[in-house]
Amino acid sequence: MSDILNLNKTYKQQPLLFGDNLGIYDSIHINQDVFNLHKRAVAQLWQADEFSFSSCQSEFAEDNDGTSLMLETLKWQWTADSAACNLYTLLQPFITNDALTQLILFNTYIETVHSETYSEIVKNGFKNPVQVINSISSDNEVITRLSKTLDAFTELRDLGVKYSQNLLKKEDCYK
């Protein structure tokens, strides 16, 4: 059949990773712990524009250590969460459990909301937000701090591509 929708799947409790390809969504044989994590996460749902960040503009206009620290924190969080927006795409080749799919998709969505929120803070809190976003790629502290995460994400992506093409067995994916 298809690798996209496994219509020949045997419906039973599935391992979270490296099991049968996903088929018809199965909430009958659900991993209750993972499903409960998803329910708890959904209960905390919020939106990037729930708060007006325009009041931050006067605070960020001040030239002091607190403002500099906040800017560095914003740049780091914004960049890290932007990378985390790729979480589902990176894990998808390995996921074989519907509850885990649902949880990781929601978590990926939340990382997108986080990224959007940091973008909104910069857009509304800084006089020149384009300058802030452009400064990230040359901020050695942010890039150095994120490099191990990006290396791990790149390795995970490469493993996922090879695993999807049956060039690796599941045992080859563990390190």
Write out the residue ranges for each language-model feature.
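Non-heme di-metal
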Residues: S2-K175
